[in-house]
Every structure is written in structure tokens, then in C-alpha cells.
């Protein structure tokens, strides 16, 4: 379900997978002031496209739907690996958006090798390498679409942030190597436990909440994909789940739907969480000096919270205090330490340029004087040797 609000009118989009369609409708209130009821009015019904781009053998089985600012409708369809299907507001099929990449597994690389050797007919009979389908998506306040891929084996494109052209921004920013969910795969009693990200929520402030189907946990990241918190889990006690299905946020609260328990659990932000989010918000607004205080408070409460060291390092780096920035980056950020060191080195060279110039000039003059003196000494010795040689030859001639 996705709710789009435009000029005070709310349109509800429902992915009706049981009937192979997406329905968009508005809700009107009828009746008197004392007795009112709500009635849905269907606006558009989106069904399987009758277009050559859509494989007619694939059932139109929508699982998720969302709408962007231009009123384009994006639909996740099971068994479609080309990305999300895109429809116009009126229901016309416009193509696909944001397909995943094919993961470079050993089988894929071997198939690519054999295709170089096989004939065209033999290559056609080989099994095609296709990407994993998109599992879920969300859209932020800046109209960027985020997609997640739930896979037991693939590690490619687990989380993507897509621009209007369908390009993954995280790849260009160097975030593609980040690990989302559990950093390590666990093995227990013959079973493999690795994260399967089944849903994503992007809050109004850019915070990313990823829901892990395997462990029942929520992994919360900031807008630069730095891990903030992990909460939830599998179990029967309060705050744990059996089978998680969806995650959403409203304000600072996070809501998780458990399909087996038929319950929604609300996670309220703690005081420590509020301090961390406040520090991130101040830093993103360019208030670096003000961001230092909440980061220092976070470190006071938890000296092992590594993100606070990075936050303080970034704050001091942007203030130009590179020595202090290196001190904080040293604990948990090689890239931050390198940036601070480069800036410190540039400042050191600029502040001491005159001294360096004088030292270099003195060295050059010294080298020149030494070279000149050495050449003169060599010339004198050469002259003396030639004179001595001539005198010896003259003595032999006289004899």
C-alpha cells in the first residue's frame, strides 16, 4: 500500500497480487456530520501490460508499489528481473527502472568464457545469467528511489539509491563496497545464517531502516550508509518477532510488522539515539561546532560508540583543526585520517613555505659553490699533472 498526497487529496495505491493488478483509489466521506462513512472511488487500475517489452509468459504479480513526484507509478513484480515496472498516471506502461546487476559469480565468469569459444547456436543453448529481482523499495523527500534485494546468495546491489536515470548513486560515491545487514555470515548446525534484507524505510531526515528477514532485526543507517543502531530479533519476548514483513517510520518512531504474530511493534527513540540523530542533523546543516557537543555527550555515555569518533573527526576537519581531527579519525576511519593528514600537510607546507624556500635556496647555492670549488680543484690537479708529465717527457728527450 502506498498513499500519495497531492493538493490535499490522498490517493491510495494497493498492490492487489491476488487479482494481478494495482488499484488506485480515493476515499470520500459521505453522510451527515453526526454519521459519516468513508467510500472508496477507483481512479485507475493497472494490469499486465500489453507491450512487447513485457514478457507475456510472466504473470503480473505485483508485490510493492510507490509513486514519485511526477506521478509515475513504480511496481515491483515477482519473477521480473529487469527492475521495477513503470506506469504513467493514466496507466500506460513506460518500461523498467533500476534493474540489478548480474553478480560476477564463478558460474557467470565460466559461462562468459565458454561463450567466447562456442558457436552462436551453442551459446544460445546455454543458461542465461540474469540478475536477482528487486524485493522492495521506498522513496525519500528528494524523490530518490531506494531499492533492496532479498537474496540468500547474492551480495550485489543489496541496497541502491537511484536517480531519475536509474543509476545507483552509491556506486559513484564509493558506497557499493559497504556491507548491509550482518557483516559476517554465520554457520550453525549445518545452516547458513546471512542477512536477507526484505524491506526498506527512508525517514524524513534521510535515516535508512533495513529489515532483515533472517534475523528479524532492523539495521539503521544514516544518509551516508554508516551504521547507527541495530534492534529487534527473533523470539517471543517483547521487541522480538517470528516472521518480519515490513518496516515503516513516522517521526522518530520505527514500526515493524510481524506476519505470524499479526502485530505491529513500535520502537521509540531512546535518549542516546536522540543525541546521535541530533549530532548528525547539525552536521548535515553545516553546524560543525554545534555538532561537537552531542558527539562528545555520546562518547561520554558510550566510549565504544565508533561513529562518535568519526563524527568528531569530521567536525574538527571541517573547522580546520586537522591535528584533533586526526586524533579522532585514528580510532576508526582510515579514509578520514588520510583526508585530515593531507590537509594538515598542505597547511604545514603553506605555513612554512618561506623556510622551505630559504633552505632549498641555501642548498642549491651550497651545491653550486661546492661544485664550482670541486671543478677548480680538479682543474688545478689536472694542470699540475700535465705539467709534471711534460717535465718527465722533456727529461727523457734530453737523455
Report residues per predicted region:
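Eukaryotic scaffold repeat domains enriched in small/polar residues
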Residues: 1-322, 332, 339-399
